[in-house]
Amino acid sequence: MINIRKTHPLMKIVNNAFIDLPAPSNISSWWNFGSLLGICLVLQILTGLFLAMHYTPDTMTAFSSVTHICRDVNYGWIIRYMHANGASMFFICLFMHVGRGLYYGSYAFLETWNIGVILLFATMATAFMGYVLPWGQMSFWGATVITNLLSAIPYIGTNLVEWIWGGFSVDKATLTRFFAFHFIXPFIIAALAMVHLLFLHETGSNNPTGIPSDXDKIPFHPYYTIKDXLGAXLLILXLMLLVLFTPDLLGDPDNYTPANPLNTPPHIKPEWYFLFAYAILRSIPNKLGGVLALILSILILVLMPLLHTSKQRSMMFRPISQCMFWILVADLLTLTWIGGQPVEHPYIIIGQLASIMYFLIILXMMPVASIIENNLLKW
């Protein structure tokens, strides 16, 4: 009798995706981040669900309800900090996952890559709205500053901002709708992740060499199920180290002050995972220009397949491109640092140079490096 997992309509889908899936024999730990992102998403949905049971999306009580969760709800503090630091782990995994895709040329799978970019945007939007919910000082002013950027759009900008706010400032209506959107968005992200996987399984995984691996495939289970489980154990370890020892390490102290529209904090800044984009936004003196640069800093990922000039897919055998890639990583770390600094000398000029470098490396230096490498192959 044939195995039930190969015949049952539902189990067949799971079987083809996680058990009998043919996988390359040489994919490294950089290929673990996809499953880790799935774990992060499930964890965020579960902790978020339990937080939503005790949270009240109202300007009068939001801050108090979060305090109530931490003080009075059984294990509320651990749920709250797992959710807050879970977002940080989520973005660490996201950046690693995207970095892996850039390094090994995974962007050649166009549909998978483009849905991945949409997923990145959706996750960033969701995280932003989540940061507003505790209704601390940084929540309120972060929401005010970032939503206000839309007013830079010519003609319809001001109307658009007031429409999003549901009034003439960030207020009760804004908080309520942000809570609604923050609740629904992870389920949309989960659905998109399914489509992401669907397209990936049409082609099969890439591998570090960038060479087709049809000749040497192994079953996903047990080889990569055990590897994923190890990655998951390390992810949970790192998350719980953060949660149990330094839960506020990545947060902003200003968010422990209730939101006050009459008092602006001296340095408005987003969570650490948005700082690189925030630095690019601030480095351009023009409002609309800054907003465009902010959007393009992420949207530029869509252009990666067009900017690929190399004869090889992966960077594994391309030392000049490797150099460019790691300079780009260093540049992003520099931008992250600058994003958290006040707008004063020398941070302004460093931010501007790092922003120029970011676009220059991606649009010019990496494609040129690839062409040089192609020519070196002829020697």
From Swiss-Prot:
Binds 2 heme b groups non-covalently. Its cofactor is heme b. CDD domains: cytochrome_b_C, Cytochrome_b_N. Heme b b566 binds at residues 97, 196. GO terms for biological process: mitochondrial electron transport, ubiquinol to cytochrome c. Component of the ubiquinol-cytochrome c reductase complex (complex III or cytochrome b-c1 complex) that is part of the mitochondrial respiratory chain. The b-c1 complex mediates electron transfer from ubiquinol to cytochrome c. Contributes to the generation of a proton gradient across the mitochondrial membrane that is then used for ATP synthesis. This is Cytochrome b. It comes from Nilgiritragus hylocrius (Nilgiri tahr).
